[in-house]
C-alpha cells in the first residue's frame, strides 16, 4: 500500500511550514516555475485540493462535460487568485489534518484497492492518491517554489528518500496511462531509466502490449537500447517538462532513440 506516501506528505508539510514562517509579503506575487501560476496560485492549488477532499463543492445543477485534470485544477485555483495570503494559509491549516486522516483511511482495504478514474490521467487504486499528492506537493514546493528552479531562497531540509520515492512511484505508475497513445507510438524498444540519489531506482520502459499500453517494470537488464540517468529529484522537473532533460540527463546507448522518447514524455 501507500502508507509511505502518507508519511511523505507529513514530512513535506513540515517543510511547507518552514516556508510559511519565512515567506515575505512580496513573495506571493512572484512567478513560480509552474507555468501561469504565481507562488500564491501554487498554494491555492494545494489548499483547494485539501478542501475539496474534505468539504467538496456541490456539483453543478446541470450536467457538464468532465474536465481534464489540469483544467479541473485551474478551476479550483481561479476563484482564489484574489484571496489574501492569510486566507490561503487559513484554508491550508483548516483542512490539512483532516486531509491526512482521509489519506490514511484510503490505505485500508477494501477501499485501498478500489480502482477509480482520475480525469484524463488514467485509472488507479485509491491508495495511490497519497502517492499522487506526495508527487504534487514535493514538485510544487521543491521545484516550483524554491530555488534554484523556483523563485524563493528559503532554508528547508533537502528532499530525502522518504519524501521523494512515493512521488516517483506515482510518476512511473502514470507513464503508461497519461500519454497512452503518444508513448506507445515512440517506445518501440526497451529504454532503461536509472534515477540516482534519494528516491532513486531503476526501471525499464517497455513497448506496448496487446492492451496498447507501455509497461515500466522496476528492474534493469531487460535488453535496453539505451540507459537514461539522472537524479530522482531532477526527474520530477524534466519528467513534467518543467525543464529540459538535456540539462540533467546522460544517455548511454542509442541517443537518437532515447531523445525521441524523452522529448515525448510529459507526466502530469
Which positions does each model-derived feature cover?
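Short, contiguous alpha-helical
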Residues: 29-70, 117-179
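Acidic/His-leaning functional-site neighborhoods
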Residues: 196-225
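Alpha-helical transition-metal enzyme core signature, strongest for iron centers
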Residues: 9-16, 39-54, 78-85, 89-103, ...
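An N-terminal domain-cap segment
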Residues: 1-44
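Short, helix-capping/interhelical loops that line the mouth of catalytic, cofactor-
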Residues: 1-4, 52-105, 109-114
